[in-house]
Amino acid sequence: MLVSVIVITYNSAQYVMQTLESVKRQTYKEIELIVSDDCSSDDTISICNSWVNKNKTIFKDAKVVQTPSNGGICHNYNYALQQTKGEWIKYIAGDDILEDNCIERFVANIKPNIFLYTCITKHLQNETGKIALYSTRIPDDTAWKQARSMLKYLYCINGPTIFIERNHLVETGGFEEKYPMIEDWPIAIRYTTSGMRIGIVDEPLVQWRIYGNSISHSNHSFAISLREAWYDYTMRFCWQYFLPLHLYHHWLNHWLLKHSKDGAFIKLFGYVLRCVDFVNVKRKIIPFNNEPYRLVKQSEL
């Protein structure tokens, strides 16, 4: 079975060689490698082209492509998806690392009617080189319980852990480009609320590089837009799926984040609200009716 490994890059010259070498070391050999660059302004493209030319015989196919314009993570994901031939897709950012047995273990754990998998993450601290394990924290349970858990505890699958079936991803519209910098949260909620549970591979298979000044943890404009998109998607879901306490929880968290310097009280209120079990009054999965980004209106329930 052919697996397409997609290395997503944007100004990744400093670390992309480490990523590519980790793909090269995979114990699973039926791999198509695609490096998809989102219009980098550094030497990423030349570095990747040089590496691929030297190592392309290792793979079933290998190439470097570039998006027509800089459109963000999800746009790059979808552009690369169009270039693939594999039955399954493994995405990895150009500064993250695959464990040597990553693809082999994902393939070995494929089960019928599960189209999206995640795994344990190794957090690689960029400044110190230290590694810490980070579990999925998503229950290996029904799709609805997984969706409810993600909303209740405000966590999701990590982007570097995504292993996804190609045809199903294409048929459901790919990644949601309305939120260009969030690839993991919308697709995880979309799949689980459509009745499709996420498969859990309880093994550390990827290293996710964490920066001390990571923009996702700062007041950088990128981080602000990221949080706004996360909030927008979550609030729409909570409102239209009758999750009033979730709705209040996310609104309060968002308000605190915007109106306090560091969102200092966000965890306190979050922990208090988590004492309450949030319940969907309909107690059922509401399908998307094959329209991947359309949330069902209250009048349709």
Model-derived segments and their meaning:
Residues S12-R25:
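Short, well-formed alpha-helical segments that are part of the catalytic scaffolds
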Residues Y15-M17, D42-W51, I97, N101:
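Acidic helix N-cap motif at the loop->helix transition within catalytic regions
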Residues I89:
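Short aromatic/hydrophobic "clamp" motif used to bind/position activated sugar donors
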